[in-house]
Amino acid sequence: MKIANFEVGNGKPFFLMSGPCVIESEQMAMDTAGYLAEVTKDLGINFVYKSSFDKANRSSINSFRGLGVDKGLEILAKVKKTYNVPVVTDVHEDTPFAEVAEVVDVMQTPAFLCRQTNFILDVCKQGKPVNIKKGQFLAPWDMQHVVAKAKSTGNEQIMVCERGVSFGYNNLVSDMRSLEIMKSTGCPVVFDATHSVQLPGGQGSSSGGQREFVPVLSKAAMAVGIDGLFMETHPKPAEALSDGPNSFPMYKIKEFLSLLKELDHLVKSQPKIEL
């Protein structure tokens, strides 16, 4: 399948979806998009800018949710035009899907909503590439049913994304077998490296996170031969308005991506061992 002007899957080099969790301001979006676009261009990595206009599943009613659909789409359109990069954003059950589809290159469905049949169908009917996040409660082999729903709309541009599985209260773990298992769906497989280290509700009224584990999990996912890496980043994670504890420090990302590119090339150049 294609995102904008590049191919994903089928052994192609990994692509990156990255940006701040939520659109905090137009200036923040432009600054982060510009920096990430420059870094990925220098490294030769295909890039999709990610940021959300609304975070509908925040832990607390008092948590910052975003700038709303109208302002958010206006900013994403400006990012896309200014830096000539594709963009991805989250959609929710009450999102005006057609309006979003006019702007973004990829629509992303939240993990909590992966079993909501009407929601999945309505999103996929827009005809855009869709990144479906696997629920924290779902076995990887059960994603075949979610994919079947999605593709029943005639949309074959479906990706599946691993973002960790619930492990007791306020904790997630990443089962790397999940990435290999989900390849059986026939869809490109994406690993969400930053939400996988989230501690849901771990700070009482907000989620915590262990960003120190993002590098090791990302490298492990590369060893499986993933098609895409999802990694939220922020210039000052401690000051982020959403998901700061698990966001990757933006100004450290170039060196890390360079390493991941080497790993990706090494793994995908090796023959698969059949057992």
Swiss-Prot record:
Belongs to the KdsA family. One of its GO terms (cellular component) is cytoplasm. GO terms for biological process: keto-3-deoxy-D-manno-octulosonic acid biosynthetic process. It catalyses: D-arabinose 5-phosphate + phosphoenolpyruvate + H2O = 3-deoxy-alpha-D-manno-2-octulosonate-8-phosphate + phosphate. It comes from the Bacteria. Its EC number is 2.5.1.55. Keywords: Cytoplasm, Lipopolysaccharide biosynthesis, Transferase. Transmembrane segments: none annotated. GO terms for molecular function: 3-deoxy-8-phosphooctulonate synthase activity. It is found in: Cytoplasm. PANTHER family: PHOSPHO-2-DEHYDRO-3-DEOXYHEPTONATE ALDOLASE. Pathway: Carbohydrate biosynthesis; 3-deoxy-D-manno-octulosonate biosynthesis; 3-deoxy-D-manno-octulosonate from D-ribulose 5-phosphate: step 2/3; Bacterial outer membrane biogenesis; lipopolysaccharide biosynthesis. Pfam families: DAHP_synth_1. NCBIfam families: KDO8P_synth, PRK05198.1. Its main location: cytoplasm. This is 2-dehydro-3-deoxyphosphooctonate aldolase. It comes from Francisella philomiragia subsp. philomiragia (strain ATCC 25017 / CCUG 19701 / FSC 153 / O#319-036). The gene is kdsA.
